[in-house]
């Protein structure tokens, strides 16, 4: 991800406690059973609401091989990287976030996961257990800011 792309989407990385016996295949199974994905891939869950056209995705990624990425994502004494990520684009109406984060919260709770949130204003460097609505509010604020900047740069009017 180059920096430009990073500002276009909100990405979360999921971790489990070191002593957890949760497997990647169990996480994949949970997503398959709880989401209606339009993706043919068995490593991506792309969820879309046809009525509102809201969408988000989960991906199962290969373990990092790049030194810098290993340093960032694999180096936590208490947590193991599940290699699952969540993605929601910015420049979207607020209800996109409401739709997506309702499921994200359930996913974290049901599987006892922790979240590395690079967009966090309080702790962008460590996996945490987010409070209710914390991720949605974080996305929503960042989305508003990015949208306003985008529309200003394009000389378009943007109504909050």
Segments from the language model and where they lie:
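Acidic (Asp/Glu-rich) sequence patches and key acidic residues
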Residues: 8-160
